[in-house]
């Protein structure tokens, strides 16, 4: 594969990218259109046409291409070594993009944006020419065709003046202008004829037109009245709708209030049910405990009554109280439970007194 990259078409432009994408390389890009003065990146083909590695241009750069020399059509010599490095520095310093005809574009440091934020230009075509004479005198040099700035409206082509071909272009334009003028004259005559025919038709149908206009006016007045009726009916319907909407909102508010009250009552009812269930459970536990306690006390009373006849009557009273206590515990009643607990305390006090005053009853030891 040859190490020479050839640039032999005017749409191929040489550039040194200002980004770090291709360090140490001169890249060649293909321009898709010449018909405007402001150029965007999108006006170039997305991938480079080719690139040439410049030895010593950027320290530490790695070759991304096998090309080491550049051949530009019109230059008798191949550009390489120091000339290639000189071309690299010139393009990089002035941010220039140039083709084989010396037509130059300048890369903007910041894109040109209009008031709407739309990017209008990233490269501007320059009226100067690139002097390929510094690199062997490439010929021919050509000037850009001129367009209104940031538009595609053509102005003129200075190169035609330099080439002496401006007269040919002017003659062609004059012929086209005469042809257009002839067509305009013919069209004017056709328009005048049509206007004459229209005026004749209007004169012949004047009477018919007046009756038609009267009928149309009556129809318009009728529909105006119908429209007003419809408008009045619509306003009444709208008032009723607003009234119904207010009543609906008020009813929804009352429903929400009742729902909130029902939820609150349901919450209190659930609490009361839970309290009742807790009370029943507690009463059951108290009754079971009281039954056990009463059984123990009955056993002791039987034991004491056998050993101490003098206490038999008192023991009988205590047993009766214990029976009453058991009855009270069977009732789910807070006051009854309190009375049962009081009797329980009284019975325990009596038994404690018996055990304290007559220990031989408990231990079976006579004094």
From Swiss-Prot:
Residue ranges the record marks as coiled coil: 165-202, 235-308
Taxonomic superkingdom: Viruses
Alphabetized UniProt keyword annotations: Coiled coil
Note: Expressed through leaky scanning mechanism. About one third ribosomes fail to initiate translation of the CP and therefore translate the P39 protein.
Free-text function comment from the UniProt entry: Might be involved in virion assembly and vector-mediated transmission of the virus.
Protein name: Protein P39
Organism whose genome encodes this protein: Peanut clump virus (isolate 87/TGTA2) (PCV)
Classification of source organism: Viruses, Riboviria, Orthornavirae, Kitrinoviricota, Alsuviricetes
């Amino acid at each position: 594969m040859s190490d020479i990259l050839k640039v032999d078409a005017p749409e191929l432009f040489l550039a040194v990218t200002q980004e770090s994408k291709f360090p140490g390389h001169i890249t060649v890009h293909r321009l898709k259109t010449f018909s405007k003065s402001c150029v965007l990146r999108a006006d170039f083909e997305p991938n480079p046409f080719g690139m040439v590695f410049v030895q010593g241009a950027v320290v530490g750069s790695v070759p991304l291409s096998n090309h080491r020399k550049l051949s530009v059509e019109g230059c008798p010599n191949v550009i390489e070594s120091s000339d290639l490095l000189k071309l690299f520095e010139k393009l990089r310093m002035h941010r220039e993009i140039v083709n084989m005809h010396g037509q130059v574009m300048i890369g903007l440091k910041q894109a040109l944006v209009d008031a709407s934020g739309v990017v209008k230009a990233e490269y501007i075509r320059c009226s100067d020419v690139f002097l390929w004479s510094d690199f062997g005198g490439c010929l021919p040099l050509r000037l850009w065709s001129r367009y209104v700035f940031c538009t595609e409206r053509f102005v003129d082509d200075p190169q035609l003046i330099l080439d002496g071909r401006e007269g040919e272009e002017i003659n062609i334009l004059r012929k086209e202008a005469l042809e257009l003028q002839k067509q305009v004259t013919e069209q004017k005559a056709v328009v005048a004829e049509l206007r004459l025919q229209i005026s004749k038709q209007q004169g012949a149908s004047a009477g018919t037109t007046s009756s038609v206009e009267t009928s149309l006016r009556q129809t318009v007045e009728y529909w105006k009245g119908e429209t007003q009726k419809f408008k009045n009916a619509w306003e009444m319907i709208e008032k009723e709708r607003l009234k119904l909407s207010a009543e609906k909102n008020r009813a929804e508010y009352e429903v929400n209030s009742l729902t909130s009250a029902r939820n609150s009552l349901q919450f209190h009812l659930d609490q009361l049910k839970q309290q009742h269930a807790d009370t029943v459970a507690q009463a059951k536990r108290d009754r079971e405990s009281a039954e056990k306690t009463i059984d123990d006390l009955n056993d002791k009373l039987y034991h004491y009554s056998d050993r101490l006849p003098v206490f038999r009557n008192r023991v009988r009273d205590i047993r009766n109280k214990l029976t009453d206590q058991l009855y009270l515990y069977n009732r789910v009643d807070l006051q009854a439970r309190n009375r049962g607990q009081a009797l329980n305390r009284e019975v325990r006090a009596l038994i404690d007194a018996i055990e304290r005053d007559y220990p031989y009853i408990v231990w079976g030891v006579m004094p």
